[in-house]
Each structure stands twice: as structure tokens, then as C-alpha cells.
């Protein structure tokens, strides 16, 4: 089920070394207050949680994942995989995420939100970016429900824009869709989140590159999406 919620005070930092991704974010999030956009490495972001666009097995062996593992130490992959085993029987579906202690001061937490099932998978023709982004923010909800106020800020890279081959503007628009869904609704379970996004598959897929789609939960007896 979904429940309406008031706008979150969560600080969101979008940060990437790819200048085209950064410019695409600036276009997609131009009218969104409270978003910090940086042309910089995720590893320099001073926040409570980093989002790692991992794969379903939690293997941190390439791209952003590998950089995070080098920075935080090999133990971070073990923590992520332990959480995946305990909470998802060893395979974390796209549209789900886990939040684990990082073992560091900055960030205190790492959120693993897969954009692909296996390493180096091309996800450019999927909605995996929207699913992963929305799932990452739902993980913030869950962590703050367990420990209120423990995640007040979060940093994300361009999900799927490197290894996943998602075009930067498409990536930015899908991340906008995932972020606005987080602000509008709190999902009680991941299946509900996935069903909500996938029910609006046509709207998201058919939107031109410069047009964003605001996802809304399915109405009783149907579904809806608004274009922005």
C-alpha cells in the first residue's frame, strides 16, 4: 500500500564526474528546490549516505561500486551481501535497495540499489534507473523509521549512465521521476513500488528526451502519470 506524506527535509546531492550527466541534471531538476548538483566524485560528498548502483548480487567490482569499495574497504561489499542474503535470499531485485552501516564516519551508511542484475549489463532500454532511484529513497524512509533522523542527506551518481549505457538526459529524467515519487509517497513494500512504476511503462518510455514524467500511484481501477 502507499500513504501520502509531506515533503521530506532530506538533502539530496547529485554528483558525477561526467559533465554531460551533470548538465542533464541541471535541466531536469531546474525547478526543484533543495537539490545540490556537483561536477565531482561521489567520494567527496559529505553526507549521511551514498547510493551505490550495484548489481543484484551486491558485487562491487566495477565503476562507482569499485571506487566505493576501494575507499571504504573490502568489508563494505561483505556488509551489502550479508544484507542481501538476509533480506532478499541472496538476490536483490531491481526496484529494491538495502541500507548498511559503512564502517566509516563519512558516509555513515551505504545504500545499495541495483540498476542491473549482473555486472556490465546494458540497461539503456529499461526503466531500471527510475526503479533504482525510487528504491534508494525508499531505503532512506526505512532507515529513518528504524533510527529517526539517521539519514538527513544522501548523494547519488548518474544511475546507469556509465556501465548501464543509459543516455545522460534519459538518466536525469528517470532520476527526477524516482525523486518526485519519493517526495509524494511512502511505499510500504518494494513490490508496490515496482508495480507503480511498471504500470506507467508507456508514459515513461514514450516521453521525448526533453520531457519528464511524474509517476503517480495507481488510482483505484486504473493508473495515471503526469508529464512535466
Question: PLM features: residue spans?
Answer:
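Macrodomain-like recognition of ADP-ribose-binding/processing modules
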Residues: 1-228
